[in-house]
């Protein structure tokens, strides 16, 4: 099928000529050395007139949509919408102040003639006459009574296509929606003690601040946007360069050689590097108990200092690479304290400092050799950050320290529209130091590294003293400046092309026809057919294929294959050394990474979620190794890639290697895989969600993680193209046979095409979601 292109690249990407490898090393030695270079590093744009640089601050952002949360009973805060997303008809929410207002909302499916139904409302069986004459829209009805045992009246109907409803407490009223989508509007009911109204939700719900009411109305009328994970950070592996020592004065310019037009100058300089870290703190929406991200960001700093009686103006940019992600999850309720991710730099991380000053040494840093630097070390100690909770004692992230040690220096170039500034990039390796860091009032304690919460600890800057030496080829006439070599701008132009191409690729997702996509996903796409639509491909087929394979060799998918191969080799050698396969690690451990934890499984949901997530991240490779007749995520990914390549007006042989590699890593980030055991299905996603259910009834059963780990070792692994929630929704609304269920579980392309040709909205919506996840 279409995923043949990825398997072909994995097979052939390790055949590279030595001369090509040497050329690759030479061209990328000082390029793309950090995943987050910032606005003043390598290929960024620097200002023409230097300003004071960025102010190191923390930004708190309240996201628009917080959730989804599970059904629960709680007192929602005033001025926040509860956006309800029910999947089945019936009572979806209840709310009362226990004095004079009892309000509930019921959902009625389409095409219901007037009939009597029994609903359990506030614990009492109530007979209601309901109807919904619409053929394609669902109907929400508010049922209201003013005493606990009084009669019920029906108010404020809402006819909805997206099947969404919302309620909010504001200004001594309960606000809801009424009318008909896509023109639904707000309505309200007056109530006393409105701030004490408890809500009981019987379906998943989201929380949206009243300041974003227009967005809430947009969701009510048009539906929720696709929920996607767009963050993709791949740390690079770096090797420190040896530092070359020179016997020279600290500050001097030496003429090494001279001809009529050119001369070689050796510049030796004492330098003082001052830098600081910057961070971003993003607080989740909702009730104020959750933080989504605490991360490092590039920090610019401009300063002056005196060198041999001369005042020097300098500018630095500090960025980090190879960060470590930590998290804390206090529970799953809206009032449980959660930090989804906070970054920490440790001994496996690197710090980059780009340095430029206004001295003669940086005027002609273009053709350079014999570049070396000696720098002192510096200790960076973290401060404290208070997590300001609405109620209760505040957790505090405090402590942590690392020391920076020089690990090499390279050239970097900063571009503007008018001038090009040539800088030195100093690379520092890290060592962890005392004190350790901890998150008070939680289990996180005695951890080492420097968290991003307060990396400067109140200091204006950190300072490093040292010196550098370089030999530069410059014009003999000191009034001339060395022209910038054309090769310097190659990577910058390519990055600009890639940026424009990524925007075009993401926009093309709206133009893909699903029926054609399924047919294309079934074709065996190889290197030639994948790139046949690109102009001048045939003339440059060999060189372009080689470039694609070289780039793909460094992709996350190729690295995963290498890691898995090593794990399988270790497992095989372990088996030969002992009698008990399970006790010393079997091939199952290579696929799942949890064989050592299987015997000590916690009964908590978070433990099972972590283990299933760990297993699921390996199942993409397992599925590639044991192909089935069903369609998989990589078939869809490759088909979308082929379609976008054919439709693109900006694609070229130069950008193809980066685009193919990015597509293999970033397309469809939210994947789930399943294994089938008789009539039982086990399904797990890389996001930690897991389900076990019966094929014929879709009734959920207990999830046995040990059985799941055994099955993924011995049984075929199948991409959950149509996931469990979609299948259950399809069965509840349309009803499907057991054979149809099996075919959908096996991702049978013939059955998928039938449902799409029948214009089934549930299946089409699921495929559309997968296509929208194919973004760069």
Curated annotation (Swiss-Prot):
Region span, DGE motif: 308-310
S-S bridge residues: 203-216, 318-380
Binding to sialic acid (site feature) positions: 101, 190
Positions of short motif DGE motif: 308-310
GO cellular component, one term: host cell endoplasmic reticulum-Golgi intermediate compartment
Region annotation (Spike foot) ranges: 510-776
Motif (YGL motif): 448-450
Position of sequence motif KID motif: 644-646
Coiled coil (residue ranges): 484-511
Region (Hydrophobic) location: 389-409
TM ranges: none
Keywords associated with the record: Capsid protein, Coiled coil, Disulfide bond, Hemagglutinin, Host cell membrane, Host cytoplasm, Host cytoskeleton, Host endoplasmic reticulum, Host membrane, Host-virus interaction, Membrane, Outer capsid protein, Viral attachment to host cell, Viral penetration into host cytoplasm, Viral penetration via permeabilization of host membrane, Virion, Virus entry into host cell
Site location (Cleavage): 231-232, 241-242, 247-248
Signal peptide: none
Pfam families: Rota_VP4_MID, VP4_haemagglut, VP4_helical
Region ranges (Spike head): 65-224
InterPro entries the record matches: ConA-like_dom_sf (IPR013320), Rota_A_VP4 (IPR042546), Rota_VP4_MID (IPR035330), Rota_VP4_MID_sf (IPR038017), VP4_concanavalin-like (IPR000416), VP4_helical (IPR035329)
Domain of life: Viruses
One record GO biological process: permeabilization of host organelle membrane involved in viral entry into host cell
Stretches for region Spike body and stalk (antigen domain): 248-479
HAMAP family hit by this protein: Rota_A_VP4, Rota_VP4
Family the entry assigns: Belongs to the rotavirus VP4 family.
Note, other: In group A rotaviruses, VP4 defines the P serotype.
Full protein name: Outer capsid protein VP4
Lineage: Viruses, Riboviria, Orthornavirae, Duplornaviricota, Resentoviricetes
